[in-house]
Amino acid sequence: MTKTIILIPSRLGASRLPNKPLLKIKNKSLINHVYEKGKSTNIGQVYVATGDQEIFDEVVNNNGKSILTLKEHLTGTDRIFEAFEQLNLKNIDYIINLQGDEPLIDVDDIINLNNLAIKNNSEIATLACKLKDKYIDNLNVVKVICNGNIEKNKISSAQNFLRSIKKKN
């Protein structure tokens, strides 16, 4: 039987919306909404990986699991890697990178991602969708460059994540 862990990178240092993970939505922090979505999949253990004591405390004080990482990580992927190494869990086959700022994510999408990761033997997976033209120049939207088209129920390898795209002349 395969084992999956869901790791949720989260930090307070966002310049566009400071303290975003701790903002309340219907009396619950954004990060706890995301954590609960991960837990409700029942596909494996869920941890929030953070370099901020405030986020760690928020999750743990609401009966969640969190792990403190270095604050200096440049990407969520780096934070997840450190958290996974610190946890030192045995027999984990797959890691789901669940974005910490997606409180409205559909639980079925997370489950489907896990199933696709297992089917394709992809050790780490994160969700992405086709980008609408109106978001191409929006620096608030992270873009992913893949080795193929992004389609529903299809897996594609991420080559890079970026906020701005250099346009060809």
What do these predicted ranges mean?
Residues 9, 97-99, 127-128, 162:
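Short beta-strand segments
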Residues 27, 69-71, 100, 146, ...:
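Active-site donor-binding loop signature of nucleotide-sugar glycosyltransferases
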Residues 106-169:
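Conserved core of the sugar-phosphate nucleotidyltransferase
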